[in-house]
Amino acid sequence: MSDDTGDVIDELFAVIEDRKANLPEDSYTASLFTHEKGENAVLEKLGEETTELILAAKDDDTEELAHESADIVYHLLVLLSMKEMDIDDLRAELAKRR
């Protein structure tokens, strides 16, 4: 695993938080925070991406598996932000599970 994986996730979360605060009109991320379905829009995306991940795994399609995994991580980070949580909350929970 690359040493900068944590940095990439931290950077992505910072972008998500910025989009949440500033709500640029042309931002997919901002649209998730203002969607008429609210958090259900993100929950639906997580369900959809999880199904796609399962199918990629069953097909042994590692390229698609990586793509769908990234989609899940992204939407999970959006959900954490919606719930006023952050990366440190996730890190703390993962640390408990070592």
UniProtKB/Swiss-Prot annotation:
Pathway named in the protein's UniProt entry: Amino-acid biosynthesis; L-histidine biosynthesis; L-histidine from 5-phospho-alpha-D-ribose 1-diphosphate: step 2/9
Xref: Gene3D superfamilies: MazG-like
Catalytic activity: 1-(5-phospho-beta-D-ribosyl)-ATP + H2O = 1-(5-phospho-beta-D-ribosyl)-5'-AMP + diphosphate + H(+)
GO BP terms, alphabetized: L-histidine biosynthetic process
Gene Ontology cellular-component terms listed: cytoplasm
The keyword Cell membrane is annotated on this UniProt entry: no
GO MF, any single term: ATP binding
Subcellular location: Cytoplasm
Pfam entry (one): PRA-PH
Residue stretches in coiled coil: none
EC number assigned by the record: 3.6.1.31
InterPro entries named among the record's database cross-references: HisE (IPR008179), PRib-ATP_PPHydrolase-like (IPR021130)
Assigned keywords, A-Z: Amino-acid biosynthesis, ATP-binding, Cytoplasm, Histidine biosynthesis, Hydrolase, Nucleotide-binding
Transmembrane segments: none
Enzyme class: hydrolase
Family of this protein: Belongs to the PRA-PH family.
NCBIfam families listed in its UniProt record: histidine_hisI (TIGR03188)
Name listed for the protein in its UniProt record: Phosphoribosyl-ATP pyrophosphatase
Native organism: Haloarcula marismortui (strain ATCC 43049 / DSM 3752 / JCM 8966 / VKM B-1809) (Halobacterium marismortui)
